Amino acid sequence: MIFYNSLSGQKEQFKPIEANKIKMYACGVTVYDDCHIGHARTYIAFDVINRYFKYRGYDVTLVRNITNIDDKIIKRANENGESTTELVERNIKAMHDVFARLNILKPSKEPRATETIPEMVAMIETLIKKGYAYQGANGDVFYRVTKFADYGKLSKQNLEALQQGSRVDVVEEKENPMDFVLWKMAKEGEPAWDSPWGAGRPGWHIECSAMSKKLLGNTFDIHAGGSDLRFPHHENEIAQSEACNECTFANYWLHSGMVKVNAEKMSKSLNNFFTIVEVLEEYHPEVVRYFLASTVYRSEINYSKENLENAKASVERLFNALRDIEPIEVNLPDDASEYEEKFIKAMDNDFNTPEALAVLFSLAKEINTLKTTNKYKASGYAYLLRKLCDVLGILFTDIEEYFKQGDGADASEIEKLIAERTQAKKDKNYARADEIRNQLQQQGIILEDSATGTTWKKG
């Protein structure tokens, strides 16, 4: 298995620290607002990778943190006239709800930053003792970036050039504009914890360093996050952790590509910013997940109506292949392994989901061909298609439920019309019964009558 390591800037053969085990950390959400489509992109990308590792037999420990104390959280809570706890709890629940709708697996561990304050304080104390950190005149503690010789190795940036082109706000207490805060002294009314430097709260960067150290150890296999976090967040994590622990922080770094909207950067100022809930009001979770998983994880992805409609058509092609056929493992044909090998080859090469999906469509085509000629063989291929779709986390909805929930006709209205048609038949008003059938047929709804009643599906 090879994949692109942002640290080295090239594809590398993956070698876990411990055979058959993977320790992976993914930077989680700062829960000051609703999750947006960019969050969905990042966490679906790493969910696919997590699922693939498990499919390949690895015992995966995935830690995905929650940043539940931050300047943005305090600011938003004050604006709303509520406590930070109320804001955080509501947004965590909303995050869990939308992630579940998108079929994102729960992480092995989901620490909140405030659960690891003692470990953060201990790391900061170590950094001060080693000369990597200092306390400013106002009480804040800062990291001394010039002390860390490898600063910039992840983002491939030179510290001297960064300093010259710095647009960082000049803070008098800092020795250098690039120095960043490790511990921030509390202002009146803000959440605070005791420390050797006075009551305050941790800086954002030290939170992830401490949580990963506590749950995965000083060195672990993979650190993941959105490409927007590469600098300064991930660069600062490396500086803190490697100075404190005197060893490599993470061996491999994975960064997911950003979402653009109609080829423009997504931002509230451009009025092209979408929350996950807003997107799911228009498109089924299956479609949204497929769309976000269909591009290589580290590439940019363009959010547009055309691309989502294409994703919808693709999802329906896969679902239609599995319609009216029962997946049966024991019926798996001997040559089915060829499809699985092609799927593995694609995913083993930097998690190439477009190529993996091409294999799934080849399988779907095979199933459709065999449905009328060899149902036994078709059912075996259907089992394999289901199995490989599960690796990508797609086709997680019941087939008929998906088509009932699809765009267009409302399910409750269809059920009312079916009930009216049933009554019309009882009353021997066959003209009205036929009229309803034709009306639904024009909406793409197919009725199937049986001794037990009438069922429907979208054609």
Swiss-Prot record:
Keywords: Aminoacyl-tRNA synthetase, ATP-binding, Cytoplasm, Ligase, Metal-binding, Nucleotide-binding, Protein biosynthesis, Zinc. A motif ('HIGH' region) lies at residues 29-39. InterPro entries: Cys-tRNA-ligase, Cys-tRNA-synt_Ia_DALR, Cys-tRNA/MSH_ligase, CysS_C, Rossmann-like_a/b/a_fold, tRNA-synt_1_cat_dom, tRNAsynth_Ia_anticodon-bd. It is found in: Cytoplasm. One of its GO terms (biological process) is cysteinyl-tRNA aminoacylation. It comes from the Bacteria. Its EC number is 6.1.1.16. Zn(2+) binds at residues 27, 208, 233, 237. GO terms for molecular function: ATP binding; cysteine-tRNA ligase activity; zinc ion binding. Binds 1 zinc ion per subunit. The keyword Ligase applies. ATP binds at residue 268. Belongs to the class-I aminoacyl-tRNA synthetase family. Monomer. This is Cysteine--tRNA ligase. It comes from Francisella tularensis subsp. mediasiatica (strain FSC147). The lineage of its organism: Bacteria, Pseudomonadati, Pseudomonadota, Gammaproteobacteria, Thiotrichales.
